[in-house]
């Protein structure tokens, strides 16, 4: 069976892994998934990520907990293959009043909503993380 939305699968693996208190989760690797993992690490939502170079590359994400509770409260896919969501620089959403982040795909690469606003760029809203 082919995977229709690999990004939604990645976010679901992170959500389920934290609900089950796993130390890390693994998934098939892709450039966009690595960019999302890098952004999540920079924002402090995951501890680390690594790509294992095998016949089929595997992305391993080390999950982060604070006092036994998952750091990621919600992680939600916004733009999907059947319905792409694009926002201009003035329309970019603030997740939880600025406490969370929206990951946005711009012409300059993947970045948070804050960075995109500072650079005066809009783009495709990939997901919300809080």
From Swiss-Prot:
Coiled coil: none annotated. The keyword Cytoplasm does not apply. The keyword Transmembrane does not apply. Disulfide bonds: none annotated. GO terms for molecular function: rRNA binding; structural constituent of ribosome. PROSITE patterns: RIBOSOMAL_S8. Keywords: Ribonucleoprotein, Ribosomal protein, RNA-binding, rRNA-binding. Belongs to the universal ribosomal protein uS8 family. HAMAP family: Ribosomal_uS8_B (MF_01302_B). One of the primary rRNA binding proteins, it binds directly to 16S rRNA central domain where it helps coordinate assembly of the platform of the 30S subunit. This is Small ribosomal subunit protein uS8. It comes from Shewanella woodyi (strain ATCC 51908 / MS32). The lineage of its organism: Bacteria, Pseudomonadati, Pseudomonadota, Gammaproteobacteria, Alteromonadales. The gene is rpsH.
